Amino acid sequence: MSAEKRELEDSGSNGELKRQDVSFSKGIAHIKAEFIAKSNDNSQFQQAYNDEEIADADRIGAEGGKNSRKHKKKQRGQNKSRDNRQVKEEKVLCPKYIQGYSEDGESLCQFGDKCRFVHDIKEYLSHKKPEIELDQFKICPVFDALGFCPMGFKCRFMSSHFDKENFKLVKRGTDEERQKLWSLDHEVNRITSEEKLSLIKRRFPFTKSNEVLDIIDSIQQEFRDITAPKVSKEEASEDKPKDSNEAEVAPQVLQREEELKKKREHQRELYLKYKDTRYFAQEKKDLDLRRKKIVSPLTTVGNLPYRRLMRKLGADVTYSEMALAVPLIQGTNSEWALPKAHSTEIPGFGVQIACSKAWQAAKAAEALAKFTPDINEINLNSGCPIDLLYRQGSGSALLDNPARMIRCLNAMNYVSDSIPITVKIRTGTRDSHPVADTLVKRLVYETDVAAITLHGRSRQQRYTRVADWDYVSTVAKSLRESEASFLESAEGKESRESKRRIQFVGNGDVNNFEDWHRILNNDENIDSIMVARGALIKPWVFEEVDAQQHLDKSSTERLEILRDYAQFSMEHWGTDEYGIAQCRRFFCEFMSFFHRYIPIGICERYPVQLNERPPNWVGRDDLETLMGSTDARDWIKLSEMFFGKVEESFVFTPKHKSSSFPSA
């Protein structure tokens, strides 16, 4: 369905919409009187959303522990103890028989009768849950898109691609036609089983990583030797044993000392070779983010179907969910699922990683460069405020240790072949001590990063106050001055002959075209803006940026967006029972932000800022009211329009406690 665009005019006191007056409506989203709910329940207005860093504590690990203090149950923060277990099938069909029996009747499974899965397809179908019948999807959405369904007999829409008379699955069109459909709609950056096994079994050589880590170690060791307190010859002679009859030193000790001596000589050679060079400098592909429409990396909600939706709605650049370096190096399945991307995301797709040490950064970047070629940049997350990562030295903890951050970036730059390296930072870890302005100077002089993204908040601040765009502009100016100074230096003339401009991207609170264009038009030092929550609450924000007008999406238009998300979800996670459960869960996670959109047509003033909260309101129709509900049970009701009737055992607990609460 094509979106109907309605330009909203400025108005006076005649009851039409007015532009936002911050002094008049600070913290409050004003709704027209006729749309304010006639209810005594004021809980929605009082409830404050907690936009704690959108990150998956379920995957990273609970932040509590044996030593954590007992607290009263809070109404804000993450629901870390929520149950995300999925219901399993009573009878599970063997993967070898998903597409049916072999034509010659021979067994397809090497385990034969000893296999723990069902080989009798009719027996499996007799225990399979009923078909999903929907108005939104008359036939299997995956079959409709690709001409075949990879889920085969396990598909909950199987009747649309099943020949009952011959008891076999059907395909649509010729092989060439299906190949053409696949070329337009497929996923990239899939790591093979053999490649993953090489990581699990530690067979992958990490040649480049070992090289650069040796260089970094030699430089650090030389620095330690220089700064170590010097011992005089007299003191050294006093330390030696004076008794000639003392027992001789053990051979193992002598051997160890000899090995250390050789290692130190090797480190000395490396240091002399690379001390006056930018050893990390490599030829990279150009990275152009100028005026690009960028979606921020978003853990959990920033999954592949969501990114694909954002590409359809006008985004130019998308990022994977944050991947942890160590699980990547270890070949963990769940972590290697994160760099996957849809073909529509190429070019303009980046992978974000989090790490605490240079060896983690180097090996993760080398593995990504080797196994996932369809990426345009690798981004180091140096801004994540999650306590667990911070205590491990990852995320925003790197802001407190810029030397370590620089080593990580240089190691990544050395091993990533032609893939540019970028970094995302915050203003600092404490409100009273911003460090970004001094940090960018070091990044210019000591690294070859292609882009810097600055979130205009500190770690301490989280989302409690608005982003400081004045400071973002200050840092952008500092970056340009440092660039100019560096390029005039002898080192700069040698190392940056191409004089590539470091891309600078601002981030924080932008959710409308007015802020977007105002910031970029008023500050040439800022190349683009990264949008996070604004693109979750209002996915068509980039359509507004292009049109340079507010778009009042109707409930049917917003339902079409949800339908696209559901379609993309089923193509990604599948249409079997497990896939549908995954689709429903992530649909509800998406709704935990999408429901916060306040239709412009019911607003007294606009645009509504992210930190503004409305009183209870009703929409212009029942569907609009339903999509604006804060009750997770209503989100589940919406999911039934796309994924069928929900199981009685299905329970969805929003990640953020304040994202949803039952209505009275």
Curated annotation (Swiss-Prot):
Residues at the catalytic site: C384 (proton donor)
Record's keyword terms, sorted: Cytoplasm, Flavoprotein, FMN, Metal-binding, mRNA processing, NAD, NADP, Nucleus, Oxidoreductase, Repeat, tRNA processing, Zinc, Zinc-finger
Compartments (UniProt record): Cytoplasm; Nucleus
Basic and acidic residues bias: start-end ranges: 230-245
Any GO BP annotation: mRNA processing
UniProt function note: Catalyzes the synthesis of dihydrouridine, a modified base found in the D-loop of most tRNAs. Specifically modifies U47 in cytoplasmic tRNAs. Catalyzes the synthesis of dihydrouridine in some mRNAs, thereby affecting their translation.
The protein's name in its UniProt record: tRNA-dihydrouridine(47) synthase [NAD(P)(+)]
Keyword DNA-binding: no
